[in-house]
């Protein structure tokens, strides 16, 4: 397998990733700003499929109409010249001080109206550029103090904002779907819709939830101490994995945004295994872009930025190679059988069986030997050892 990425791999990068200048809460920028046109050309040279952006990554918040027109003209020309796509667009409702208490859930109604208008205008741009997904990350939607929010009203306002945007997409006939991006905290002390599970529960309450799904991020779920592969699996199972953000994270701490696979490597392996191979017993598969949302080390110049971009794609392709070999290994297939993974794919009730039939089946309870069943060895360690051996290239 070649480690040279091609557009067929569908690797995408946020403009805010390779364009991150290194400024953080404790220090100023360590790199100059990156021209979006240069980012398009460089990512194309590296074999990427697409580039994504927040509205203000591309067009400054205070740009004039003529400045905006020129920026978009140059950006579109670069896309046309390189063939790079813009599969996803999102809106910045977190950087400007006006959003210090949120966008959709600010206690200031005028700010909420401004935020919603900003989102609707950005939806128009996303559709114009041929995007398929419109991500919403509510980084400022939350609080530090529980008494500062009517939590029911905040969720009502979040629902109102998302439903209004979704209805606008439908009214305009745009081929867009909305993907909510969960995160537990940072920059707010507590962010609304902190995990995949919260996101799924929220979507179930929406009027236009049919076009609203999720954009889980590796580090965001792991910041909450959760299993990222389990999270995306449930989103996929629910038909709501609309987009995915891949990066690296080491434990419960601030959002590290490392190169994919440079954090929890075993978790990264099983993430790629799920994305590429699907569930062992079949079921829905993810067919969207493999999007990298990371930060190049602020200790590097732009030579290091482009090396880190290549590293994300190389790590994914290496893990894909290992994951394909893992599933194709006869020993692994036998271990999956021994561990009961295939048996888990069998319905507990027989076809057409009722609860009355189950209760009448003596073998299911009265004659069931719990002590004997408890002696079964599932050999999960053996199965995991095989996975690690494939991950390390030992098989």
Curated annotation (Swiss-Prot):
The record's GO molecular-function terms, alphabetically, read: magnesium ion binding; xylose isomerase activity
Positions annotated to bind Mg(2+) 1: 181, 217, 245, 293
Q: Which cofactor does it need?
A: Mg(2+)
Please tell me one Gene Ontology term that the record gives under cellular component. cytoplasm
The catalytic activity, as recorded, is:
alpha-D-xylose = alpha-D-xylulofuranose
EC identifiers of the protein: 5.3.1.5
Per the UniProt entry, what are the Gene Ontology biological process annotations, in alphabetical order? D-xylose metabolic process
Where do the catalytic residues lie? Answer: 54, 57
Q: Where's it mainly located?
A: cytoplasm
Q: How is the cofactor bound?
A: Binds 2 magnesium ions per subunit.
Q: Which SUPFAM superfamilies match?
A: Xylose isomerase-like
* Localization per Swiss-Prot or TrEMBL: Cytoplasm
The record's InterPro entries line, in alphabetical order, gives: Xyl_isomerase-like_sf, Xyl_isomerase-like_TIM-brl, XylA_actinobac, Xylose_isomerase
The entry's Mg(2+) 2-binding residues are 217, 220, 255, 257
Q: Which UniProt keywords apply?
A: Carbohydrate metabolism, Cytoplasm, Isomerase, Magnesium, Metal-binding, Xylose metabolism
Query: Quaternary structure?
Result: Homotetramer.
Instruction: Spell out the NCBIfam families in the cross-references.
Output: xylA_Arthro (TIGR02631)
Family, as annotated: Belongs to the xylose isomerase family.
Please give the name of this protein.
Xylose isomerase
**Organism of provenance:** Arthrobacter sp. (strain FB24)
């Amino acid at each position: 397998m070649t480690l040279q990425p091609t557009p067929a791999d569908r690797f995408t990068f946020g403009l805010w990733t390779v364009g991150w200048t290194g400024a953080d809460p404790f220090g100023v920028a360590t790199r100059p700003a990156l021209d979006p046109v240069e980012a398009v050309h460089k990512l194309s040279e590296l074999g990427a499929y697409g580039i994504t952006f927040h509205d203000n990554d591309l067009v400054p918040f205070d740009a004039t109409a003529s400045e905006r027109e020129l920026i978009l003209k140059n950006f579109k020309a670069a896309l046309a010249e390189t063939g790079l796509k813009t599969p996803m667009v999102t809106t910045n409702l977190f950087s400007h001080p006006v959003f210090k208490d949120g966008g959709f859930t600010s206690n200031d109604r005028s700010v909420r109206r401004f935020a919603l208008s900003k989102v609707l205008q950005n939806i128009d741009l996303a559709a114009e550029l041929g995007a398929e997904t419109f991500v919403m990350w509510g980084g400022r939607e939350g609080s530090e103090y529980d008494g500062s929010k009517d939590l029911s009203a905040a969720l009502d306002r979040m629902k109102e904002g998302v439903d209004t945007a979704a209805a606008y997409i439908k009214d305009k006939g745009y081929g867009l779907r909305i993907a909510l991006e969960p995160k537990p905290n940072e920059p707010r002390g507590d962010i609304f819709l902190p995990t995949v599970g919260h996101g799924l529960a929220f979507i179930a309450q929406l009027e236009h939830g049919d076009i609203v799904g999720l954009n889980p991020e590796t580090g965001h779920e792991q910041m909450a101490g959760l299993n990222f592969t389990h999270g995306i699996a449930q989103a996929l199972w629910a038909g709501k994995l609309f987009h995915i953000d891949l990066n690296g994270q080491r434990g419960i701490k601030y959002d590290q945004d490392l190169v994919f696979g440079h954090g929890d490597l075993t978790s990264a392996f099983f993430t790629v295994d799920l994305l590429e191979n699907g569930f062992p017993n079949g079921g829905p598969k993810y067919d969207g872009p493999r999007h990298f949302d990371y930060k190049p080390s602020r200790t590097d110049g732009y030579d290091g930025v482009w090396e880190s971009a290549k590293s994300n794609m190389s790590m994914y392709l290496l893990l894909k190679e290992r994951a394909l070999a893992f599933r194709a290994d006869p020993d692994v297939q036998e271990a999956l059988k021994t561990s009961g993974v295939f048996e888990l794919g069998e319905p507990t009730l027989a076809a057409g069986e009722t609860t009355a039939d189950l209760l009448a089946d003596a073998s299911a309870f009265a004659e069931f030997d719990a002590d004997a069943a408890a002696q079964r060895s599932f050999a999960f360690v053996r199965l995991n050892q095989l996975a690690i051996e494939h991950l390390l290239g030992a098989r």
